[in-house]
A protein has these predicted regions:
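Catalytic cores of DNA base-excision repair glycosylases
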Residues: 1-132
């Protein structure tokens, strides 16, 4: 029910305040009901082609495993850390590649396929999985 209410309220605001257009401003997106950092970044990057870093579960898992962040599960903190090391124009594509890699190779529910991983030589977690 909450999601449906958020969608309805969001559509009403987009119609009344933005004349049926999605705002191109990150902070304006965050003010919309049901829109958080992940959705706002996804819209900024995929819809408007602007710099964005989408920290979903795959991105967070891989950033921890390869050592881009240290045992951090907070999406906002992972996003902040990535902004420091990823060129803005590369952020959106980088995150999409992490999602693809996380689904196909560096999986969460099964043992990752480290032997097929293009990041194996720099991955901190590889040794842990090799010992299992």
């Amino acid at each position: 029910k909450s999601k449906a209410r958020d969608i309805s309220a969001c559509m009403r605001i987009l119609h009344e305040q933005y004349h049926d257009k999605v705002p191109e401003d990150f902070n304006a997106l965050l003010k919309l009901p049901g829109v958080g950092r992940k959705s706002a970044n996804l819209i900024m990057g995929d819809v408007f082609g602007k710099p964005a870093i989408v920290t979903d579960t795959h991105c967070i898992r891989l950033c921890n495993r390869i050592g881009l962040v240290d045992n951090c599960k907070d999406p906002a903190k992972v996003e902040k850390a990535l902004w420091k090391i990823i060129p803005p124009e590369e952020g959106n594509g980088f995150c999409h590649r992490l999602v693809d890699h996380g689904r196909a190779v560096c999986t969460a529910r099964t043992k990752p396929y480290c032997d097929k991983c293009c990041l194996a030589d720099i991955c901190r977690a590889r040794k842990e999985f090799a010992n299992e």
